[in-house]
UniProtKB/Swiss-Prot annotation:
Catalyzes the methylthiolation of an aspartic acid residue of ribosomal protein uS12. The gene is rimO. It comes from Cupriavidus necator (strain ATCC 17699 / DSM 428 / KCTC 22496 / NCIMB 10442 / H16 / Stanier 337). This is Ribosomal protein uS12 methylthiotransferase RimO. GO terms for cellular component: cytosol. The lineage of its organism: Bacteria, Pseudomonadati, Pseudomonadota, Betaproteobacteria, Burkholderiales. One of its GO terms (biological process) is tRNA modification. The keyword Transport does not apply. [4Fe-4S] cluster 2 binds at C145, C149, C152.
């Protein structure tokens, strides 16, 4: 690898980070153009003189080597007509990124000068070490949370929201798909807030600008997954207004019609004590609108029963909401004080037996709803990802079922050799039975 670094100390640090990553991945750094298989030019675009110096350096690298990736401030700069300056002057460059774009630069390097994977010398595969079955994986897009829910201490442990660079996220997703992952589960503490901390900064992926924002990321992940015949599933989607933008993507098949939205409660006074959005009526309207746009949508949520000060009337509001909203998958926890949570200081703490009794009543209603909704699937043919095959047949999951937390689809043993299936494969299953949690069917 050849490297040219121009500009201010901030650009120098960017160069150091890129070179560090290159060396960590086994790329050697050449001091000459003719000794390099590829050249990275980190540019400056602050003043006209710096722009010209950067353009000259790019031209020299193209003349002397011919394979050039451009990064830095000039990479993000446009001319009066709105065209990228670098691409307009030097159309032969292989890729262009803006500043502070380690992920985008490395993705371009991997595209144009792949480092061969040698199983005898490389101890870590490109997709990384995973503890899940090889056909599904979790993709964390951010760390931390900006909310201060009174029952939660995650911000004190993990800090405020820090979004991963969008190109870094996309590169990891691509590596996972290449490694055979058939289901990508997008996670974070607050998936909907992705990019808020960087003001939805525009990054680059495959030579195209891509905003650091949930809607744009989900669309790009869906497009990438389609190339590998894979699923994308969204988790921990805080109910911001822009979540409404995701539903059309689900109805169009870009990502699974599955939304994990942690609602926590339905009574406005309880939600206020929780420091959560406090308009259950609006939430119900949104759920109706989502299902109108995407009728096959599965909604999962989690709730807390027995929160400090919760009255029987407030709890009944929650039960009524669950029955009316007909949420497909729910989990409910009896409130438990967590050391450091501000909810511990709220008046009206309920006895353990009351909290547990309310949780049990909640789950009774939720299971009745689940049984009704699952019964409607009998007779349908569902696409199922097989997780396991044994002598009794197969066990898999439909688009409505996330691993570990939702239901399963039990698949009868194949009657013919042509119907045989393996773990990690998709099969079409005719549903023949259902209970309150799981489905049964045959290929």
């Amino acid at each position: 690898m050849g490297f040219v670094s121009l500009g201010c100390p901030k650009a120098l640090v960017d160069s150091e980070q890129i070179i560090t990553q290159l060396r960590a991945e086994g790329y050697a750094i050449s001091g000459t153009y003719d000794g390099a298989d590829l050249v990275v030019v980190n540019t400056c675009g602050f003043i006209d003189e710096a722009v010209q110096e950067s353009l000259d350096a790019i031209g020299e690298a193209l003349t002397e080597n011919g394979k050039v990736i451009v990064t830095g401030c000039l990479g993000a700069k446009k001319d009066a007509a709105g065209h990228d300056i670098v691409s307009s002057v030097h159309p032969k460059v292989l890729a262009v990124t803006g500043p502070h774009a380690l992920g985008e630069v490395m993705q371009a390097v991997h595209t144009h000068l792949p480092k061969p994977h040698d199983p005898f010398t490389d101890l870590v595969p490109a997709a990384g070490i995973k503890l899940t079955p090889k056909h599904y994986a979790y993709l964390k897009i951010s760390e931390g949370c900006n909310h201060r829910c009174s029952f939660c201490i995650i911000p004190s442990m993990r800090g405020d929201l820090v979004s991963r660079p969008v190109a870094e996220v996309m590169l990891e997703a691509e590596n996972l798909f290449k490694a055979g992952v058939k289901e990508l589960l997008v996670i974070s503490q607050d998936t909907s807030a992705y990019g808020v901390d960087v003001k939805y900064r525009t990054g680059f992926w495959n030579g195209r600008p891509l905003k650091t924002r949930m809607t744009e990321l989900v669309a790009a992940l869906g497009e990438l997954a389609a190339q590998y015949g894979a699923w994308v599933r969204l988790h921990y989607v805080y109910p911001y207004p822009h979540v409404d933008e995701i539903i059309p993507l689900m109805s169009q098949g870009h990502v699974l019609p599955y939304l994990d939205v942690p609602l926590q409660h339905a009574h406005p006074d309880v939600l206020k004590r929780m420091k959560r959005p406090a308009n259950a009526e609006k939430t119900m309207d949104r759920i109706r609108a989502w299902r109108e746009i995407c009728p096959e949508l599965t909604i999962r949520s989690t709730f807390i029963a027995g929160f400090p000060g919760e009255t029987e009337a407030e709890f009944q509001t929650l039960l009524d909401f669950i029955a009316e909203a007909e949420l497909d998958r729910v989990g409910c926890f009896a409130y438990s004080p967590v050391e450091g949570a501000t909810a511990n200081d709220l008046p009206g703490a309920l006895p353990d037996e009351v909290r547990e009794e309310r949780r049990a009543r909640f789950m009774e209603v939720a299971e009745e709803v689940s049984a009704r909704r699952l019964q409607r699937k009998v007779g349908q043919t569902l696409r199922v990802l097989v997780d396991e095959v044994n002598q009794d047949g197969g066990i898999g999951r439909s688009s409505a079922d996330a691993p570990e937390i939702d239901g399963l689809v039990y698949i009868a043993p194949p009657e013919r050799h042509a119907q045989r299936y393996r773990a990690g494969e998709f099969v079409d299953v005719k549903i023949t039975g259902a209970d309150g949690h799981d489905l049964w069917g045959a290929v």
